[in-house]
Structures are given as C-alpha cells and as structure tokens.
Amino acid sequence: MEFEERYYRQELDHLRQLSKLLATEKPHLARFLAEKEADPDIERLLEGVAFLTGNLRQKIEDEFPELTHGLIRMLWPNYLRPVPSMTLIEYAPDMDKTSVPVLIPRNEQLTTGAKGTQGNAVLSAYSGNEHDVAPPCTFTLCRDIWLLPVQLDQVENRSTPRHGIIDITFAVAPGTDFATLDLNRLRFWLGNDDNYTRYQLYLWFCEYLQGAELMAGGQSIPMPEFMLKAVGFESEDAMLPWPGNVHSGYRVLQEFFCYADSFLFFDACGIPALPDRLKENCFTLRLRFSRPLPADIRLRDDSLRLYCAPAINLFAHHAEAITLDHQRQDYALVPSRHFPDHYDIFSVNSVVSQTQGKHRKADLGRPVITEAARHWPAFESFRHQMEYSRKREVVYWQHRTRTSLFHRGFDHTLAFIHADGSLPDASLLNNEVVSVSLTCTNRELPVQLRPGDITGTTGKNASVASFRNITRPTRPLWPVIDGSLHWSLLSAMNLNYLSLLDADALKQVIANFDRHAIHHPQMARLSQQKLDAIERLETTPVDRLFTGIPVRGLASTLSIHPEPFVCEGEMYLLGAVLSHFLSLYASVNSFHMLTVVNTESQESWKWAERTGQHPLI
C-alpha cells in the first residue's frame, strides 16, 4: 500500500483543531497546545499520531486489496504483474553462409552484449559504481524467426489511378537451390517510423489485397491462394507469459495497448514451390490491391523488414535464500542483494526446500540421513487439500505485493500460511532453507539502452547471422494495486450479453487495460479522446449456417469518429483487436462478428465470425 500524504495532513489538521478546543476548555494547557510556539515535543507527538492514524485510515479505505488481489491472481494474474520493457530485434543473415532455412527459436535469451560494450557501460554507470560489473539486461525472443538465403532489396509503389501495386524485390544468395526455398516462411514487419504509412499499409494488406504474382527470370508465376496473414493474435504469438485458464482475448487487448508494434507483422501464405530451373539472383513479389494506395503514403526500403521479432525483458532467476521462522508473518523476496536496482520480480514460479530424514539402512545397521526436495503448494491455486479446521497440516506459500516507498514498483514478500490464513506451527517449518524460483525483469534499466545495444546472447546463436535491437526499449509499466480499479476489473470479467448493449461499458473495459493512460498524463488525454470517439455500440442476435447447421450468435456494430486517430489504418487495427476480444462475450457453440463504421466517411469494415469462448456454466 502506497503511503498517501493527504491522509497524514488531514489527520494532523484534525489533531490541531482538537488541540485548540482542548486549550479553550483547559487554559492551563494552552501554552502546550494552542499557541503558535508550541512545545516541540508535543508537536512531534502530534505528527507521529497523525502518521499512524493516517496509515490506519488509508488501510480502512483501501477497497480490500487482500480480497481483490487473491481473486485477480486466480482469474487474471497478469494484471497484478508489471509489463516489462519491450523492443524489436532484427537478424541480419550472412548471405555467404546461408544456403538453407535456419530457425531462430522463440525463448532465445539475448543480452546487452559482451563485457565492456556500450550497453553494459551504461548499466554499470547506472549502478553507481563504474568498476562494478553490472549484470546485463536480458531479453527473451517472443517468436520464431526463419532465416532464408534472401534479402529484401527494394520496395516500390507502382500504383495506377485505379489499382494499387507494390513491388517487393528480393536478392538471393549465390548457390541457392530454389527447390528448397520455402517463401511461405517470410514474415514482414511494417518498420517505417511514419505511423501514417505503417497503419495504412496494415489496412491495405488486410482489406484490399486482391492478388499477387512472383516475377523472376522474365516469367510471371501466378499465386491464386496468396494471402498476408496478420500476426499477433494466436497463442504462439504471445509476448507475455499467459496462464492457460485465462482467455487470450485479454492478452491481445493488453499487449495492443502496451506494445502495438508487436501486431504490425504479416506472414506470407500460399506461395507455390518455385521451379527448379530458376537460377536467378533476384525475384520480385508483386502485390495487387483493389484500390490505389493513398497519395501521401511514403514507401521506403525500410517500410518492410524481414527477420524481425519482438523481445521482452523477462528471464529466469532465483531469489536470495530464505530461512523459515515460525515467528515471522512474511519474508522479503530479494532477487539480488548486490544489485537490488537491477532486478524486479515479475512472478514467483516455485518454492522448494530441502528436508532431512533418517532411516535405518539394512546392510549398515545404523541411521542414514537423507535429503529430499519439498515442493510447497501455492495458496492462490486450485489444488487445496481437504482438511479439518483443527488439524491443518498443509502449508501454502502466498506472494504478496505492496507499493514501495523507496523506488518505483513494488516490494515483494512471501508468506507461509494454512488454507484459512493462519500461521503454521514451528514443527511444520523446521527452520528450512527455501529456494524461490522467479521470473524477473531488469526494472527500469532497459530504458537506458539505445538501438543497437542488444547484440549478445546467453546460449548458442546461429553463426550465420548477427542481430541487434532496432527500436529503443520501452519503459516498464507497473499496475495499480490499490483503489477501486480492481473492482471495476472484476466487474468486466463478468461477461454477459448486457455488456455489449452500452458503449460506456465497453469504454470502461478498454480503459482497464490501457496501462499507458494510467501512468502518463499525455497518453491519458490521447486515450480519452479515442474513447470519446466511440459513439455507438449496437449488438443484435443473428443466425448463420455453419456446415449446414444453423447457429445463433451476436453481431456488433461499432461506430467510431476518426478525428483522434492517425488514419483509418489505426482505426482498423483497433477493430481487429476488439474483434478477438469481443468473442469472449459469445458462448461456446456460438459466435461473434464485429463491424466498425467510420462515422465521417460511412465506410465500414467487417471481420469474420469468431467462435465464442464464454462457457455456458
């Protein structure tokens, strides 16, 4: 719980007013209480009482976080976790060494480089002692990357007055066998710094792509099944670790508001196998659109990038060892005593201790001491054992957080309690030494990094490619753990048909996930303008035939004014995210379909029916 000074000042003012009243009734105490030059000892006493009563009053008015935290940790634990720093990693394959596709798997650990590099020098200076070797910032690659023996050479806009055309020219490594070149592994990222261009390209790729052809060696290869599939909505595209009991629609909404760049990816699909006789050193992918590209769009060679993937500042770590003592209510979780500012806790994964036991070995005839691992169960889980209230023996661990008074973020503690919240007896703890496995971040250190600082790896990396971060790491975002916001979030999780009848209800749900708006006043104003642009939400039941079977679902029409958005493409991306999220409101064996209407131009975009995910019971 974060200490709020207003409670202290209100209580101190109340005590001073009472002092004046008391001095009026008892004049012999006036020189201690009512006079301006009061006794300093009395003044310190009043301030101390005001501090204690202010804390007590704040605790009474804190909206029962002990209850809401437990519910949210079970229903949606990521809301009480910080959103770590995120960035984009680009690989550059060595064309002289790459002849076949090479996979860079997700979960690859990337760091700020070798000792003495510029990135690590910044971190050592940040730690306060340039002679200390600060631990590097560690990022985890969130998606697979396929490296192919091709490079993107040129992107050209060849639109006509009636149709849009984009030519993407690729250079091929010498000696490449076209028979083994699977171009369906190509993934594009809209990497232009111009938000207008990248959002408009997103709209054109999703809505107006009409066809494509491959041109190489003077011949054109038609591709009737070609499509560009938007990336970021499937479970394998997740950036944040996501529990299995929580629907991915919440993840999509949270990641969109925290890092929209992770959704600007497209997979090339439907490219046929190339003829074996091709021996070209380049080829061109021509994309045809049903309408010309906007006149003010600016296509450059970096408007499309290959071999990119988002990375997140998350890694496995162990906390300092804890010795259990039955007289303590909780224990501080410290990832590192030497570099406390370099680590922050994202989640507690497991709690394990070593227990000793004696047994008599038959061949020796004497007791032998053995050690076994004891895995402590989590309190906020669905694995509680049935016990009588007077004979409780199972001890659970509980991760507790409160807003830190000394730095941004939280202070973390670990408590060992019974199922009813009571403290266990000393015999159940046995002064054991506990090892706590964590998932950690580097707190705010990645903000000090610049593009090109992340170039190292903790394990084996493909020798055929180098890599670097091409965007500056974002600032981590901590959740709000006090106040009425949690009750609003729990209300939003109570999904039902009535939630789709009111635009204000949808705005409240969206606001709960927009963590940038919570921390930054400027982003809050921009977010509020976009929420105000949602004018109407109309939802009606509809019937559709799926494989000849009639199915009833929900159809929602969202009317949005385009003024606060960069362009129509940004509106379309928001609609794509909401299409995945709103499928939560349709029950199993049902569906939901979304239509977004631009209230200024009356243009509309419709998304395909999405199967419902809300259980009936």
Task: Cite the ranges covered by each PLM segment.
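Mixed-charge (acidic/basic) macromolecular-recognition segments
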Residues: 1-24, 33-36, 227-232, 236-276, ...
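Short, Φ-rich (hydrophobic/aromatic) sequence segments
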Residues: 41, 45-49, 71, 205, ...
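Extracellular ectodomain segments of secreted/surface proteins
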Residues: 41, 53-60, 78, 152-163, ...
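Short linear motifs embedded in intrinsically disordered, proline/glycine-rich low-complexity segments
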Residues: 52-59, 70-79, 84-100, 114-115, ...
